UniProtKB/Swiss-Prot annotation:
PANTHER family: RIBONUCLEASE P PROTEIN COMPONENT. The gene is rnpA. It catalyses: Endonucleolytic cleavage of RNA, removing 5'-extranucleotides from tRNA precursor. This is Ribonuclease P protein component. It comes from the Bacteria. It is an enzyme of class 3 (hydrolase).
Length: 117
């Protein structure tokens, strides 16, 4: 299995996001809300939604890079065949400057492992 994050593994279309928001199931912890829905494919796709309230663009982009990296490196433990949308919560925004990559990694990976169809 390759560790790249290919174009086909990205959620890009508005209708895909809307379908997940409407019909998807959710999991959450203090840092993230994860929405997911079966996609009928043999691989999972990732979408990230970060509101402007989270902070300035550099901060939002840093979080998105972290989430993509966690997804990319953890493909082996994330169930296949799901569309996944990750949304950060307010607590992560408030603590973002004090939190390191590995704390975010642990919190997000715990949620992603719980995805089941």
């Amino acid at each position: 299995m390759t560790e790249s994050f290919t174009r086909r593994e990205r959620l890009r279309l508005r209708r895909d996001f809307l379908t997940i928001f409407k019909e998807g199931e959710s999991l959450q912890n203090e840092y993230f809300v994860v929405l997911f829905k079966k996609n009928g494919l043999d691989y999972s796709r990732l979408g990230i939604v970060v509101k402007r309230k989270f902070g300035k663009a550099t901060r939002r982009n840093k979080l998105k890079r972290w989430v993509r990296e966690i997804f990319r490196k953890s493909k082996g433990v994330i169930p296949k065949g799901f569309d996944i949308v990750v949304i950060p919560r307010k607590k992560l925004s408030e603590e973002f400057e004090q939190v390191d990559f590995w704390a975010v990694h642990e919190k997000l990976l715990n949620l992603l492992k719980r995805i089941e169809g």
